[in-house]
Amino acid sequence: MEGKTLVLGVIGADVHAVGNRILDYAFTQAGFKVINIGVLASQEEFIRAAIETAASVIMVSSLYGHGELDCRGLREKCQESGIGDILLYVGGNLVVGKQEFSEVEKRFLAMGFNRVYPPGTMPEAAIEDLRKDLEL
């Protein structure tokens, strides 16, 4: 898995750090090089880290319910920055209130995300998807 780098962080005004650390550990143990930009991260910080490290994937976490607002336009900014083909994964409690996950997923896929995960998804699911999407 040499060279398979991913950028991991918690977007927006979200300070939920525990899940971020768990994901960092799980992806590292699975053999990925994790660039963890931590909490309170802007879209620009994700993109800058991805460019600087030649990452294959940006993984966005959001637990405070405003992920939909915070993630809007990320794919377009990636395209403008020359990394339009990068894989975009997002997961967590992405919206305020109780909404059908299938509807939330549709909206994030329409925003250009490749994978969307509901609250409570185990890291192994994302690891399996990473291996498929990166053809490992």
Swiss-Prot record:
Pathway recorded for this protein: Amino-acid degradation; L-glutamate degradation via mesaconate pathway; acetate and pyruvate from L-glutamate: step 1/4
InterPro entries: Acid_CoA_mut_C, Cobalamin-bd, Cobalamin-bd_sf, GlmS
Enzyme Commission number(s) of this protein: 5.4.99.1
Keywords on record: Cobalamin, Cobalt, Isomerase, Metal-binding
Enzyme kind, highest EC tier: isomerase
CDD domains on file: Glm_B12_BD
Summary of subunit composition and partner proteins: Heterotetramer composed of 2 epsilon subunits (GlmE) and 2 sigma subunits (GlmS). GlmE exists as a homodimer and GlmS as a monomer.
Protein name: Glutamate mutase sigma subunit
Organism: Desulfitobacterium hafniense (strain Y51)
Encoding gene (name): glmS
